[in-house]
Amino acid sequence: VLTIFLTEDSKKKLNRDNPQLNLLKNVKIFYKTKKELDNYCSKDQLTHQSLVAEVKHVEQPILKEFIKKNPDKKNITLVILEDVTDPRNIGSIIRSAASFNIEGIIVKERSFPSESKLLYKSASGCMELINIFEVSNINTTIKYLKSKNFWVSGFDLKSNKDFTNHDWKGNNVLLFGS
């Protein structure tokens, strides 16, 4: 977090004196009116709760480098999102993936809204907890992962298989989208 903008009312709720709770120790804080925060957020069609944070863009790793650095790691689980482009949906998936200890999410670089403030807001702080691998071609990436002993599982509403009965040991890729 680089900068925090908040209203005078939210200032009262912020405890900056307790070092154990002081997560904003080295962060610049500016006090604004609710209207100023509304104006700041309206251009991106965002809402706020009397607090707006300006964050540094998180540099994401490269998939092949990640695989090379973890050659002996077992039970890696990755998620591929194919043609999932809505920032709210992607943010929600990032939150879920972080809660299930997914190692990373693979997305097509041309259709991933990496600079979307709505994506960051929808991810609710989980962008920093999960690797996002941007790739140029999903099919080539799947072939590469298969060559590195990953099992790829696609999901279909009409399938008669129950994924909860599947043995998820080993390296897995969960494919969502079209």
PLM features: residue spans?
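Histidine/lysine/aspartate-rich catalytic loop segments that bind and position anionic ligands
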Residues: E103-K161
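Short amphipathic alpha-helix with an adjacent loop that forms part of the alpha/beta core around
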Residues: K64-P71, Y144-K148, T164-W168
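Active-site/ligand-binding-proximal alpha/beta "capping" segment
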Residues: S153-S178
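Short, glycine-rich nucleotide/cofactor-binding loops
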Residues: L78-R88, K108
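N-terminal positively charged helical leader segments and presequences
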Residues: V1-K68
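Amphipathic alpha-helical repeat scaffolds
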Residues: T85-I93, N137
